[in-house]
Each structure stands twice: as structure tokens, then as C-alpha cells.
């Protein structure tokens, strides 16, 4: 679904700047082209640290053991880039430290996640990654804004429910 969404965004009239208010894993954002500037925001500090780290050449591991997973989960601030990678890429269902990802076929989730992330990041080398609340993001005039918020009545990164009503009020003010 990321490619069709990116096509719609690229057909949007006007704007030199593309702004994503909730970039997440950048599945859509990595496919958007034709803008001189990309501002990609998310409020998850470890996710943004990971994206910035990979953008700057951080060498992600290809293997993470369950013991390493637990250690990184308990010591996130020792290496925020690695914590972001392991917390999402090596976790069950990609949920932030939602349990060590494993299956019966022995899939190497670290290797799979690294490969996928590096592929997407190849198109985001010039992107500006921002960690913040979407309501406080400085959006340049005439930007094309993409907002794919958390689903209504779901638990967000911090355990708080996303306020969909407040989101729509903020969107109407843009």
C-alpha cells in the first residue's frame, strides 16, 4: 500500500517540502520523490535516533540473541540507535520491545530488518528527521503534509491512547 500512497502524495499540487507528521518506519516516506526537502517527524525518540544513526552510517548488527535483546531493552540509553533498531526490528510484530521475535523456521529478524531499513534509508539520506509532537512541528509554508496517525483507540508508544479528536482539530487548523 506504500507505493500507491506515495504516488498520490507526489501528485499533490504545489510544495517543495514534504512533511510527514508520523513517519514511523518510513515505508511511505521512502517512496516519495520529487521534493527538494523532506521533514520526517515522529515522537518516539529511539526510532528517530535509529533513523538518524543509520542516515549517518551506523553499522547495524545482523544478529541479536535473546540475551542481547533483554540487555538492550534494560539499557536503552547506552546506545539509542541500537535500542531503536532492536526495539522495533527484533521485536514480535515490530511492536516496541514487544518480545524477542522468533518463529519455527528460524527467521533472522535482525538481518531481515537491517536489509529492509537500509533499502528504505537509501532514499532518505537528505531527509531531516525530527523527534517531537506533531502539533508543535514547524511546517514550512506551501508544504505537502502527510499524516498517518495511530489508529483510533489503540495504545501508542508510551502506553497512552492517541487522541483522534484532538488530531482532527489540529489538522483542520493547518
Language model: regions and residue ranges:
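Class I S-adenosyl-L-methionine-dependent methyltransferase catalytic core
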Residues: 1-174
Amino acid at each position: 500500500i506504500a507505493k500507491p500512497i506515495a504516488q498520490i502524495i507526489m501528485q499533490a499540487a504545489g510544495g517543495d517540502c514534504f512533511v510527514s507528521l508520523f513517519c514511523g518506519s518510513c515505508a511511505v516516506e521512502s517512496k516519495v520523490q520529487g521534493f527538494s526537502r523532506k521533514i520526517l517527524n515522529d515522537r518516539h525518540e529511539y526510532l528517530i535516533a535509529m533513523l538518524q544513526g543509520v542516515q549517518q552510517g551506523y553499522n547495524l548488527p545482523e544478529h541479536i540473541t535473546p540475551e542481547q535483546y533483554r540487555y538492550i531493552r534494560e539499557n536503552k540509553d547506552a546506545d539509542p540507535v541500537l535500542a531503536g533498531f532492536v526495539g522495533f526490528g527484533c521485536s514480535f510484530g515490530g511492536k516496541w520491545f514487544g518480545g524477542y521475535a522468533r518463529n519455527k523456521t528460524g527467521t533472522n529478524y535482525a538481518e531481515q530488518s537491517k536489509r529492509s531499513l537500509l533499502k528504505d534509508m537509501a532514499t532518505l539520506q537528505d531527509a531531516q528527521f525530527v523527534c517531537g509532537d506533531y502539533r508543535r512541528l514547524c511546517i514550512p509554508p506551501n508544504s505537502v503534509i502527510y499524516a498517518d496517525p495511530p489508529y483510533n483507540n489503540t495504545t501508542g508508544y508510551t502506553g497512552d491512547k492517541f487522541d483522534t479528536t484532538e488530531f482532527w482539530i489540529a489538522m483542520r487548523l493547518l
